[in-house]
């Protein structure tokens, strides 16, 4: 699926490339992703814990990374905001997890995870606990509140993700109206 001239994944990669050339894409199975052409630092890895949902994917990405701190985002978020991501990375020292919180809702797939989370995530997965929020009780978390997010992304478009055809159509309309790329 494309939004503007790019696929959803290309839009995500474009926003992440300035942060690190080593971009890890976790997939449920071995997939060929032709939209990765031109992104030499992007590599595709297969989920170590298939069927374990988001938490398994986060574990796999962290296990494959050599970085102490890692931006973890969903591949279907076409409107990531680099300034907000940069702000979150800047907050990460001294925390295991930096995650946006809008009221009662947190965005675990738009967060900075320390590799220190690996052992905690592994224990959760081995116990069959798949809820990402369970990790929040085990690690030092810095919540990025709405008032902070609003300074960079007042429309909260960073958290828009494409799950349905209607979402895809809405993303295309947003891209035509508001977003340069």
Where are these regions (language model features)?
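A residue-level signal for conserved active-site and pocket-lining positions in enzyme catalytic cores
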Residues: 136, 164
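Nucleotide and nucleotide-moiety/phosphate-recognizing core
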Residues: 1-129, 137-156, 169, 173-179
């Amino acid at each position: 699926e494309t939004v503007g001239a790019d696929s959803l994944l290309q839009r995500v990669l474009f926003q992440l490339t300035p942060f690190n050339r080593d971009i890890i894409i976790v997939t449920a199975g071995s997939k060929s992703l032709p939209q990765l052409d031109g992104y030499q630092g992007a590599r595709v890895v297969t989920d170590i814990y298939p069927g374990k949902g988001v938490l398994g994917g986060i574990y796999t990405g962290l296990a494959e990374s050599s970085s102490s701190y890692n931006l973890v985002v969903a591949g279907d978020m076409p409107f990531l905001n680099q300034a907000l991501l940069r702000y979150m990375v800047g907050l990460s020292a001294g925390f295991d997890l930096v995650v946006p919180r809008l009221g009662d809702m947190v965005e675990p797939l738009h967060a900075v995870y320390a590799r220190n989370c690996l052992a905690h995530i592994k224990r959760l997965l081995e116990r069959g606990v798949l809820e990402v929020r369970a990790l929040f009780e085990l690690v030092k978390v810095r919540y990025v509140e709405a008032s902070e997010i609003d300074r960079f992304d007042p429309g909260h478009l960073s958290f828009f993700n494409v799950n349905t055809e209607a979402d895809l159509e809405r993303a295309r309309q947003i891209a035509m109206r508001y977003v340069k790329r």
